[in-house]
């Protein structure tokens, strides 16, 4: 019998029951909850007269609907102007209060984006099964965990039973060897991966990211890569546990302490694929061939190096892809053959669960330091992913660097990643965004999103158009 992949080990460790129809019951260790996908789940529990099976496994925080300006945040929940958004946050508060669920409320210093708060507090740990009613839950797989997004009915089911009905996926290894060049970031790595395999390339798979580049990558970088596994079509992404993982987790609020820490580390050391493990698919990239990336279309797979030009749909032989390219160019207001560097931006967004951690903030600050935002850029906002990130950045004086350069420093939240709060694009506006999705209308009706790294977004804010940050 061959060895096991990391995914095999995590699956087997949490398998409660294998069913004849191919589905299985998985035990869930950690359930992260936010205000958008939980109200109906809590109401379902209430109607069925059920209580959460393990209250101590649930951690909640509002993020999608929260305002990011200091003025609105000063009034707490009441400061949320949109009535629907306000009700969703209030409902989360009341449900958590009623059931005794730990919640980092809107003005709690620990509040933030669920996928930032989970790892940084130690609520999400290696070896866990982790679910949240949000597709980017895959982020937490960077810890050596099995982390998946679930729907609202599944949120209710996990609350009630501590189990999830799921079918085992196939396993894919995405191996990135070699070394990254200067100015090339984890965001560029994952965009390059998606550009290679497409947004359906990982469908039906759990992706393990490996190779020299991943082994040398910081934990925050790994979180960025696993965050966008879903954009490659995979429900889960993960990275094997190593010293970088353990050093990151040690000392965090919810991490084991003392003797329990030593026991945990001993167990976590096995959270890696065996040398003789066989994957269902293997994809290989070379780190030195990856350049700073910019998305040009309305799907994350429509991405190119910054020094490239927009492709011509007429040269595409696949009719479906050709039609998709034509529609994307029309929506984005771009032309085939146009240089990426000739795309001007109206707004810049540095934040989201993909790129709002302290390393991301530092990278952006390094680019804008001593420079001034281009007058043609209407707005450039920097939104830390959590209260902890915000406090750390301010302790380092990074907020002042942004403000002096003409960028806005905001409060934690999902912000302009999606049009569910006050931070939105106007119709036809182009945005250099460090988020994860560039779908039509994702950042606002008619908004045109270009996915980039924090450093590339910061450079665009200064230049007013896309530039190669390596030459900036």
From Swiss-Prot:
Residues 61-80 are annotated as: Disordered. Keywords: 4Fe-4S, Amino-acid biosynthesis, Branched-chain amino acid biosynthesis, Iron, Iron-sulfur, Leucine biosynthesis, Lyase, Metal-binding. Binds 1 [4Fe-4S] cluster per subunit. Its EC number is 4.2.1.33. [4Fe-4S] cluster binds at residues 353, 414, 417. It is an enzyme of class 4 (lyase). GO terms for biological process: L-leucine biosynthetic process. Pathway: Amino-acid biosynthesis; L-leucine biosynthesis; L-leucine from 3-methyl-2-oxobutanoate: step 2/4. InterPro entries: 3-IsopropMal_deHydase_lsu, Acnase/IPM_dHydase_lsu_aba_1/3, Acoase/IPM_deHydtase_lsu_aba, Aconitase_4Fe-4S_BS, Aconitase_4Fe-4S_dom, IPM_dehydratase_rel_enz, IPMI_cat. GO terms for molecular function: 3-isopropylmalate dehydratase activity; 4 iron, 4 sulfur cluster binding; metal ion binding. Pfam families: Aconitase. It catalyses: (2R,3S)-3-isopropylmalate = (2S)-2-isopropylmalate. Its cofactor is [4Fe-4S] cluster. Belongs to the aconitase/IPM isomerase family. LeuC type 1 subfamily. PANTHER family: 3-ISOPROPYLMALATE DEHYDRATASE (PTHR43822:SF9), HOMOACONITASE, MITOCHONDRIAL-RELATED (PTHR43822). Heterodimer of LeuC and LeuD. Catalyzes the isomerization between 2-isopropylmalate and 3-isopropylmalate, via the formation of 2-isopropylmaleate. This is 3-isopropylmalate dehydratase large subunit. The lineage of its organism: Bacteria, Pseudomonadati, Pseudomonadota, Gammaproteobacteria, Cellvibrionales. The gene is leuC.
